[in-house]
A protein has these predicted regions:
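Generic multipass alpha-helical transmembrane bundles of integral membrane proteins
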Residues: 146-157, 163, 170-263
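C-terminal transmembrane helix-loop-helix hairpin of multi-pass membrane proteins
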Residues: 139-143, 155-158, 163-181, 207-212, ...
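Cytoplasmic-side transmembrane-helix entry/capping segments in multi-pass membrane proteins
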Residues: 60-61, 87, 108-119, 141-142, ...
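Soluble N-terminal domains of membrane-associated systems
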Residues: 1-49
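Alpha-helical membrane-inserting segments
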Residues: 73-77, 94-103, 119, 123-131, ...
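Short juxtamembrane and helix-loop transition motifs at transmembrane-helix boundaries
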Residues: 41-55, 68-80, 95-108, 192-206, ...
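Hydrophobic alpha-helical segments embedded in the membrane of multi-pass proteins
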Residues: 64-68, 89-97, 118-119, 214-221, ...
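Core alpha-helical transmembrane segments of integral membrane proteins
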Residues: 56-155, 227-228, 232
């Protein structure tokens, strides 16, 4: 018995996607088991039932959310043209299909990020060369935005700041490897097209009008609700969280005056979302992640990290270091905002 007691078994679980509906169901099962309404055997059975595979409708919705997210990011942050928006949305759907195929194929999943980057860059260059000129970098960045590990970088810094050093460093390493794979895919596709004589025509088309920010924000909020598999009853909450987080970040940047606008805006957005998530968890008795996870998706600096690694591989060391410092600043600002949000309103539990 002493030998058994001194034996430790470590099981490695593959990182899964965020599924807010199943998270809420698991939270409800735990609450009912603690309250004595469910015995352990029945609770365990219900938890096992949560591992059911996605339905055909859920898979189609997930693919569509990739396209909607890419198109909305192209309009909301990059202020590209209508053509760039449409092409980014189509490429986003292609990446959604690749991601769906990789979910059930472990060998494909290892290289899915690089394959997605190759596909996105190749399609953008071919369309720009033979159909209509595009802003290549904007289209590729918008189409890959869901794969860029901004959320992983944020969670890594948050865990490190909470003294969870092992898990934080592991997340940081995973996020950096994803950035390297995405950057490698874009550079490889660019060089491959150049080898075949396919040259993109860079041409600045008229940008989208300013009023498109608001419908793009609503479309992004709906896309995130689908992407994070939120239950229909939680869709209004998710949409409000995304809209409030974005508007708070923009407002915080406008009132910063002499301070850097981006870090101040991200801090204000993180602070408000962190407090809102804890208030929602306390009064609705549901996980605060329903607000926190989709709400900060527009705040995480994943695109900055992608650009930093891209500049580094292009041997533009100065610009890469400058962008890398901006990445660190934004990460610290966002994590600081979330921590102060927890300080204002204490969380109900870790979810």
């Amino acid at each position: 018995e002493e030998g058994v007691a001194q034996t430790t078994q470590v099981m490695r679980l593959a990182p899964g996607e965020v599924n807010l509906e199943r998270l809420c169901q698991a939270d409800d099962i735990a609450d009912r088991a603690i309250a004595g309404e469910l015995d352990l055997r029945e609770g365990f059975r219900r938890l096992r039932d949560l591992g059911r595979p996605d339905t055909r409708r859920e898979k189609i919705g997930s693919i569509a959310s990739y396209g909607l997210s890419a198109a909305s990011i192209a309009a909301l942050f990059l202020h590209s043209s209508w053509v760039d928006l449409v092409v980014a949305g189509v490429i986003g759907v292609i990446i959604g299909c690749i991601t769906l195929l990789a979910a059930s194929r472990p060998r494909l999943a290892v290289a899915s990020d690089a394959i997605s980057a190759v596909a996105a860059t190749t399609v953008a260059i071919v369309v720009s060369a033979f159909v209509v000129p595009l802003a290549i970098k904007s289209v590729v960045l918008a189409s890959l935005i869901i794969l860029v590990p901004g959320m992983s970088l944020t969670n890594a810094v948050r865990e490190i700041s909470s003294q969870h050093l092992v898990s934080g460093m592991a997340r940081m390493g995973g996020a950096m490897s994803t950035l390297l794979k995405l950057t490698f895919g874009t550079i490889a596709a660019t060089q491959l097209c150049a080898a075949f004589g396919i040259r993109a025509r860079e041409f600045a088309l008229p940008p989208l009008p300013g009023w498109t920010d608001y419908p793009a924000l609503l479309i992004a909020a709906v896309a995130f609700a689908i992407l994070f598999r939120a239950a229909r009853r939680d869709w209004p909450v998710v949409i409000v969280a995304v809209v409030v987080g974005f508007l708070a970040t923009r407002w915080g940047g406008e009132i910063s005056e002499s301070l850097p606008s981006a870090p101040v805006g991200v801090f204000v957005g993180g602070l408000l979302l962190g407090a809102m998530a804890n208030v929602y968890a306390r009064f609705a008795h549901r996980p605060g992640a329903v607000i926190r996870e989709p709400g900060i998706l527009l705040l995480v600096p994943g695109s900055v990290g992608f650009r930093s690694v891209s500049f580094l591989l292009e041997r533009d060391t100065s610009l890469s270091m400058d962008t890398g410092l901006l990445l660190v600043t934004l990460l610290v600002s966002l994590v600081g905002g979330l921590m102060f949000g927890d300080l204002l309103v204490s969380p109900r539990r870790s979810l």
